[in-house]
């Protein structure tokens, strides 16, 4: 047996034994009462009459559970928890609703979104250009003169019935007097005439920003299209020119975005930094929200260098400021990424030719990875293409060789759409994980046009990753690429369908619904060092759960994306509830700012589902 095969078997045995131990503790608790945990007093919260999907393979279902001090204490039948109900126990009758562990997005840019939440018009759920333009027209009526109307990612032209984007002519007709910016994936942006005027892009050079273009007509005037070529720098640099919120408004926006995530059943995120997120300044707001005890989503953060050529100095400074794992269960620091060095960044626009990494990538990036490894800082690295992975894995193997054959525990790769089996074997040997997202579901037609349907069928090769024992987490890459709605991603995993309805995968790359939810719970917990601590409804784990509006295990495929939460709890604390569970709801948040926000009209998923 080869070394790779032995490693894979050992990893699978470890995972299997870990799960088996967890399951056995659940059985002991359910059958024999207070065997492993000392419960002084009654349970704080009991949920009963539920259809519980525990994500525990030994005992996958239950009908009740009890919570004490923020942890699951007992899981089993209604009768198994009845003796834990006292005069001060909060009891929730789930009325046969499906209950699952709280969802965990292993790759999102939620901290950044919180700073802007309330300024953006969202097209995530819109299914036609006609409706999108109608929403834009509605915002024109209510947005003060001088303020921007912005649509910043989360949608694809493939989801529209017309199978196209709105045209600049249509946008200019609807919004002649307000500057409008439509941010499409990291491929291109659309600016109406008023926006071009405000930005003065008629007089800006075509190559204003590195590896990006301002499209000009034959007279040298900006057409309204700005293009990643292949870098999206021009797109988010343009965003930074738009008005922002006051700090108090950013705090409130962060709380509202957390509530929006709670409505969708999210209780944890692993944040991937992003453009504009310079550590530590850009994290002041989220730290303030956490410090005041106002967080309703668990957050793990990573540091993302903003300027090429300064990455090593940035990481050296940050290493002197903070350690991996520093923080608590609600907010903690994880490591570096998703960008470590700009020379190692390969972007993700499948309508364009595959970009090459910079020629000096090994010279630039190797010292940075070694610095991180020497200081036990795990990292996450954006890698889209197999060709990029082959180069970077050479560096990782060199770094691992200097560290006893290992990288810092918890090091992983983001994306991996076109990874080969050989690349997966190398990742498995290094004991790295892979965080996957439904980015490809937003670009399926572009991918097929360039690479063909056969290549699409294993983009990314999720089942191969799992068979090799590689830790895999579910995610979105929200909010400027995909929607932050986890159920679009779960639908993609469980059906193999794109946002436009293309059947991308066969059975060899499609998961069951429970497997998809496992990636979004237990799977994602690995990426913040929380494996065994959260992700399952199981004794001794953090009591994060959601009561769903529909039985996601039974509804037709087409209805999976309509799933949301009727009640969400984080650490046993109820952070969202409505309809029949309204009496358990926490106090409403102050109104979102600004007072002309699109959230008051076209709204978000809260407004879509809750009214």
Please provide the spans of the model-predicted regions:
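Active-site microenvironment of metallo-dependent hydrolases
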Residues: 1-85, 127-144, 191, 251-263, ...
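Short acidic/histidine-rich active-site segments
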Residues: 377-387, 465-489
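Histidine/acidic-residue-rich catalytic or RNA/ligand-binding cores of hydrolases
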Residues: 193, 279-283, 388-397, 444-450, ...
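Acidic (Asp/Glu)-rich catalytic clusters
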Residues: 321-328, 427-429
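Glycine-enriched alpha-helix->loop->beta-strand junction motifs that scaffold or abut catalytic
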Residues: 428-435, 469-471
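Non-cysteine beta-strand/loop elements that form the S-adenosyl-L-methionine
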Residues: 330-341, 432-440
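Flexible glycine/proline-rich, aromatic-decorated loop/lid segments
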Residues: 108, 432-465, 486-498
